[in-house]
Amino acid sequence: MAKKIIGFIKLQVPAGKANPSPPIGPALGQRGLNIMEFCKAFNAQTQGVEPGMPIPVVITAFADKSFTFVMKTPPATYLIKKAASITKGSAKANTDKVGKITRAQAEEIATTKRPDLTAADMDAAVRTIAGSARSMGITVEGL
């Protein structure tokens, strides 16, 4: 028989830097889950990832106080900012452009994000990434 699910917890945790402090501790603690067990398992799974890269994670909490978690791909905004070599997007995206990325960089980001995107094909995924970049005040060359 399947375990009874008591809830899902969605967090963004820096790769390799999960610790019991907020936001992880309170989110897991209120459901009675072992915080250190999650931190050790998450840090072990993110060893090959660039340290500090935000990784979205969905934790499934079960009634017997056990859990499983699924890691998603890093946020598109993080990957776009990294490709454009900027620290933050524009406050006025339509008027102030803060950087630019090429179509090749957008394709690379789309390839990374593909498992989490709902795009039907690669071209649609690239257009999705380009739209995110434009909303951050970053121009996409070759699109």
UniProtKB/Swiss-Prot annotation:
InterPro entries: Ribosomal_uL11, Ribosomal_uL11_bac-typ, Ribosomal_uL11_C, Ribosomal_uL11_C_sf, Ribosomal_uL11_CS, Ribosomal_uL11_N, Ribosomal_uL11_N_sf. Keywords: Methylation, Ribonucleoprotein, Ribosomal protein, RNA-binding, rRNA-binding. It comes from the Bacteria. One of its GO terms (molecular function) is large ribosomal subunit rRNA binding. GO terms for biological process: translation. One or more lysine residues are methylated. The keyword RNA-binding applies. Forms part of the ribosomal stalk which helps the ribosome interact with GTP-bound translation factors. This is Large ribosomal subunit protein uL11. It comes from Herminiimonas arsenicoxydans. The gene is rplK.
